[in-house]
């Protein structure tokens, strides 16, 4: 195994690297975390939970955990604060919604303009209705900053169906540029 002492930090992905979709450790994952010890930083593109919430889920399943656990939701929150984004329309689940409400105002109506349309995960329910609301918002306001907080499109292993990255692409593409001013920002692995 490489000498990890030569590195200041070792950033590793979670899903498919350390654990499966049920957060069960993969073979060799605990040993790897032991070897990299306090240099380890777990980064997950999850837009639905924070690093603290992910660490809680993993606690007790691994003998050792990285000293730091970060998710795309954590990076999104920092981005919203640093960019002074005060109002958003949120396309995502209730867990992310609760976290985002601590730092910004979430608007439930598409009638008034917001600072950004934020995509964190697939909505818990009524995702077709939520998708239609995004399309109506774009059509009505003609101007939107769209932020994707989970840029994964393809996942390793067996196909699991639609994900929020695919929905973001479907909802944000093919608008005539001369009529619609859409800016797209992806937050995740590229942002660390």
Which stretches of residues belong to each language-model region?
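HAD-like aspartate-dependent phosphatase fold
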Residues: 1-192
């Amino acid at each position: 195994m490489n000498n990890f002492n030569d590195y200041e930090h070792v950033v590793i992905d979670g899903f498919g690297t350390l654990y499966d979709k049920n957060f069960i450790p993969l073979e060799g994952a605990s040993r790897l975390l032991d070897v990299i010890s306090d240099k380890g930083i777990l980064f997950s593109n999850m837009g639905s939970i924070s690093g603290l919430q992910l660490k809680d889920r993993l606690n007790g399943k691994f003998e050792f955990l990285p000293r730091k656990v970060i998710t795309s939701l954590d990076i999104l929150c920092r981005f919203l604060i640093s960019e002074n984004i005060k109002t958003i329309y949120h396309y995502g689940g209730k867990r992310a919604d609760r976290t985002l409400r601590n730092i910004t105002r979430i608007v439930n109506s598409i009638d008034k303009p917001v600072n950004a349309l934020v995509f964190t995960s697939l909505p818990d329910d009524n995702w077709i209705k939520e998708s239609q609301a995004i399309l109506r918002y774009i059509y009505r306001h003609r101007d939107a900053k769209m932020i994707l907080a989970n840029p994964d499109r393809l996942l390793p292993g067996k196909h699991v169906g639609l994900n929020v990255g695919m929905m973001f692409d479907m909802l944000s593409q093919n608008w005539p540029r001369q009529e619609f001013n859409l800016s797209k920002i992806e937050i995740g692995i590229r942002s660390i």
